[in-house]
Amino acid sequence: MASKEINFSDSARNKLYEGIKQLSDAVKVTMGPKGRNVLIQKSYGAPTITKDGVSVAKEIELADPIANMGAQLVKEVASKTADAAGDGTTTATVLAYSIYKEGLRNITAGANPIEVKRGMDKASAAIIEELKKSSKKIGGKSDIAQVATISANSDENIGALIAEAMEKVGKDGVITVEEAKGINDELSVVEGMQFDRGYLSAYFVTNTDKMTAQLENAYVLLTDKKISNMKEILPLLEATMQSGKPLLIIAEDIEGEALTTLVVNKLRGVLNVSAVKAPGFGDRRKAMLQDIAILTGGQVISEELGKTLEAATLADLGSAARIVIDKDNTTIVDGKGKTKDVKDRIAQIKTEIENTTSDYDREKLQERLAKLSGGVAVIKVGAASEVEMKEKKDRVDDALSATKAAVDEGIVIGGGSALIRASQKVKLKLEGDEAIGYDIIKRAIKAPLAQIATNAGYDAGVVVNEVEKNSKDGFGFNATTGEYVDMFKEGIIDPLKVTRVALQNAVSVSSLLLTTEATINEIKEDKPAPAMPDMGGMGGMGGMM
């Protein structure tokens, strides 16, 4: 077992401080509308240029093991804030550093760390309550565009694209970000439900120019069975043929005789049919088949439910106004299911999202929710170079997450002013070292505004003092113009969720670090260089001299 080094009290906390300071110094330069970029060397490929706080934090590993422990814990603040709110990582990092710095000064002077932590927790909880009271519900498309624009580093084009995407697919819709082939940004919206399964045979294609199979006013057969015997589906095929409507078969698989017969009858013009595999795997496949059944007003033919293909009738089939299938995807537009059934299914999925503890399951449930409730929007980001593309894509991802957070919980004034305004309204009566914890938070809360002002080239002390002097709710500092304005009117806003989560995470980690009394780390042992191999046996070369 490797030897361990142990550090205690002030020695441990001071070394942790060094790591937290280094990480904060690297991250804070990106803050605000006039924040700078950070250039990051990669182990392979070109360096990355980014203004994304969490991307900077993730790259930091320090040589000193104790300083590195401090940096890694604050890195966790940034990551958790990004996971929960999608933005606010730089704010969380700056707050964590400021809280730890203020707290360390007081604890070194003799304050009790546990009492200080208790006061800090009470102060942050009270400030968050004031933030909630001052928040406003997000309005229409223009509010959404403003939130997205600010988070995308004042890029109005990105803000407009995100606002348009949200308008088209709704707040529960899925918006994905991809790289465009050219230099222009684009938005495309997939209407209806789309899943990633294409036709089982190219012979099902009806539009050879686009290589798609298009079915108008079609029936949909859904089963979790593998179909290989034609006799199983013959009664249904005859019934659909007599109805004169096209048919889409969605099954676990269709193979052998069954697939061959479908293709032959399609080519002869006897049947207008297409077939695809069911989306997903295992239990998720069953759930998605049920989603499609509800959307189209059909039934899933499953032996688990006591239903067989031979006994199925037209009444068991779903239907849709239009179905488009290419080699990779199937899109069902205007399913004929009952609106109430679809709404009930959406409510059920939302409940499952709230109850799940798995990020992967939550992501898959949200995809299902989007497919049922409004479709999928794809923002394609264009740029002149790969480096610019990565940086821009990061900004779009941030802006998208911030916008969703704003829709969830509402908005507060931006630019770091909301924290100061909420702090001014909190009047806690605490005693002893708890009061010190309260004062630490009240002082540290000014750090985001101070950093935004510094990055924009203004005197941080003057700016913070000016904002504190004016008690109007919307009053704040516009770092882009250097003016003091009504932030709501100017559209300088932040999602409440981003500000709230940043403060909660910063206080949580900083207060734990302040109550740390000892650190334990491995001592790196310098391994001696390997010995040179024995050169015996080369003596015969002496004659070459």
Swiss-Prot record:
Q: Which family does it belong to?
A: Belongs to the chaperonin (HSP60) family.
| Keyword field contains Isomerase | yes
* Alphabetical list of PROSITE patterns matching this protein: CHAPERONINS_CPN60 (PS00296)
Which locations, inside or outside the cell, does it occupy?
Cytoplasm
Annotated GO biological process: protein refolding
Sequence positions that bind ATP: 30-33, 51, 87-91, 415, 494
GO CC, any one term = cytoplasm
The record's annotation in CDD domains points to:
GroEL
Mind listing the UniProt keywords for this protein, alphabetically? ATP-binding, Chaperone, Cytoplasm, Isomerase, Nucleotide-binding
SUPFAM superfamilies on file: GroEL apical domain-like, GroEL equatorial domain-like, GroEL-intermediate domain like
Molecular functions per Gene Ontology? ATP binding; ATP-dependent protein folding chaperone; isomerase activity; unfolded protein binding
Annotated function: Together with its co-chaperonin GroES, plays an essential role in assisting protein folding. The GroEL-GroES system forms a nano-cage that allows encapsulation of the non-native substrate proteins and provides a physical environment optimized to promote and accelerate protein folding.
Instruction: State the source organism's domain of life.
Output: Bacteria
Q: Which reaction does it catalyse?
A: ATP + H2O + a folded polypeptide = ADP + phosphate + an unfolded polypeptide
Q: What is its EC number?
A: 5.6.1.7
Name of the featured protein: Chaperonin GroEL
Q: How does it assemble?
A: Forms a cylinder of 14 subunits composed of two heptameric rings stacked back-to-back. Interacts with the co-chaperonin GroES.
